UniProtKB/Swiss-Prot annotation:
One of its GO terms (molecular function) is phosphoribosyl-ATP diphosphatase activity. Pathway: Amino-acid biosynthesis; L-histidine biosynthesis; L-histidine from 5-phospho-alpha-D-ribose 1-diphosphate: step 2/9. Its main location: cytoplasm. It is an enzyme of class 3 (hydrolase). HAMAP family: HisE. It comes from the Bacteria. This is Phosphoribosyl-ATP pyrophosphatase. CDD domains: NTP-PPase_HisIE_like. GO terms for biological process: L-histidine biosynthetic process. Belongs to the PRA-PH family.
Length: 110
């Protein structure tokens, strides 16, 4: 299975769990609990990635990055953001000649 197919397949499964919940599904549980729970998990997993990177354990870091990626994808489905939207934005950023930090848009509201 190529790299994109793994990501696409997982994303499709997450979308399916949102549309057709399965009893006992962790993904379904996250959607049932709602945005606050999903965001809490994204925050937790982000912290775990940072700790794993600091510990310099590649296997642990890979696992934590996978956990974070999964929870980000759950958030994307919850907020109705498609993978192709992310791909298009990454492509636009890749095409920029200069992407200095001081030239980025500022966050206007939190």
């Amino acid at each position: 299975m190529n790299k994109n197919n793994v990501i696409d397949s997982l994303f499709n499964i997450i979308e399916d769990r949102k549309d057709k919940p399965i009893e006992g599904s962790y993904t379904g549980y996250l959607f049932e609990k709602g945005l606050d729970k999903i965001l809490k998990k994204v925050g937790e997993e982000s912290s775990e990635v940072i700790i794993a990177a600091k510990n310099e354990d590649e296997e642990e870091l890979i696992k934590e990055i996978c956990d974070l990626t999964y929870h980000i994808m759950v958030l994307m489905v919850e907020k109705q953001i498609k993978l192709d939207g992310i791909e298009k934005e990454l492509e636009k950023r890749r095409e920029k000649i200069c992407n200095k930090k001081n030239e980025r848009k500022t966050i206007e509201k939190l």
